[in-house]
Amino acid sequence: MTVFVDHKIEYMSLEDDAELLKTMAHPMRLKIVNELYKHKALNVTQIIQILKLPQSTVSQHLCKMRGKVLKRNRQGLEIYYSINNPKVEGIIKLLNPIQ
């Protein structure tokens, strides 16, 4: 019985990992997450300036990653985004080993 439960937990963990990878699996999202990894926290305006992307594009991708990949923290009128998941940091390190 314990073996079955262990396999079920492992399977659920793999499903969560697959969902995380699916959420990140877009070039623009990877760029955003990479910048957040480098800078620790950025607001939307800063991300727009760094990546030279339209505000609507950045906001759309941030919305898709909120919760699973990113967290937001309000500081006055600004909302700062940062990486919410240690697995995400591991993925970025794997993709950019020189940083």
UniProtKB/Swiss-Prot annotation:
The gene is pagR. PROSITE patterns: HTH_ARSR_2. SMART domains: HTH_ARSR (SM00418). SUPFAM superfamilies: Winged helix' DNA-binding domain (SSF46785). Represses the expression of the pagA and atxA genes. This is Transcriptional repressor PagR. It comes from the Bacteria. The keyword Repressor applies. PANTHER family: ARSENICAL RESISTANCE OPERON REPRESSOR ARSR-RELATED. Residues 43-62 bind DNA. Keywords: DNA-binding, Plasmid, Repressor, Transcription, Transcription regulation. The keyword Cell cycle does not apply. Residues 9-99 form the HTH arsR-type domain. One of its GO terms (molecular function) is DNA-binding transcription factor activity.
